[in-house]
């Protein structure tokens, strides 16, 4: 089941940074903002994969091999409509 609030919080956190966020840092920021320390990795991954499929976020690997997430221009435009 989609969690639109979780998706919006992910987009808002990614919009605040220029270079993207490591996956664990993003998940921690989302947990804090939503006040949900019980957020599961599966819930988070479902939401971020949905956003990636829609072209709102992109995933890349930094030089030390960590997964980093960033927001696309389409993602920024989607946030303007909220």
Where are these regions (language model features)?
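Short acidic, glycine/proline-enriched loop segments that cap or flank alpha-helices
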Residues: 17-18, 35-39
